[in-house]
A protein has these predicted regions:
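Active-site-facing substrate-recognition patch
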Residues: 1-39
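Short, glycine/charge-rich flexible loops or terminal/linker lids adjacent to PRPP-binding catalytic cores
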Residues: 55-98, 106-112
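Short acidic, glycine/proline-enriched helix-loop-strand junctions
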Residues: 37, 53-68, 139-154, 158
Length: 159
């Protein structure tokens, strides 16, 4: 069962890649190259898929002397502490961000993250995933103003 609610004969777990030293480095390096010409304030996305990607992006961008702030979007705001739904360095109203996630099927998690950002006045118009399963995410995200880019498409794996 996928997070989108759909059933599938295969499950792509991006954390198997992003929680290894080599995988985290490679994903971060590729995404940094994909966003190098973007005028943006931060990169982040829905927990849990975006968590290791955001951490790797922050670290590698710092090492490369082009630091990028990162953030994580919770499914719901915390009921204690800061009571925020968007965690990380404070994003100001009007900030422009790029969303990231490990896998996109329908795009639901990315859309929910965008809605949370919309509520605080943060602008997201692009999302990058490691794998696009090619099951509707491109069209669904376009409906909410997000352009989806991916490192891989499902067809790249012969699936």
């Amino acid at each position: 069962m996928l997070s989108s609610g759909r059933e599938s004969n295969y499950y792509l777990d991006g954390r198997v890649i992003t929680l290894t030293p080599e995988g985290a480095y490679l994903v971060a390096a590729i995404i940094l190259d994909m966003i190098k010409d973007e005028a943006l304030d931060a990169v982040g996305g829905p927990t849990l898929g975006a968590d290791p990607i955001a951490g790797a992006l922050a670290a590698l961008s710092y090492v490369n002397k082009c630091p990028v702030k990162t953030f994580i979007v919770r499914k719901q705001a915390k009921e204690h502490g800061t009571q925020r739904q968007v965690e990380g360095p404070a994003l100001k109203k009007g900030s422009r961000v790029v969303l990231v996630d490990d896998v996109a099927t329908s795009g639901k998690a990315i859309m929910e993250a965008k809605l949370a950002l919309d509520k605080i006045g943060v602008i997201a118009d692009k999302a990058i995933v490691i794998v696009d399963r090619s099951e509707g995410a491109v069209d669904n995200l376009a409906k909410v103003g997000l352009k989806l880019e991916s490192i891989f498409k499902l067809a790249d794996f012969g699936l």
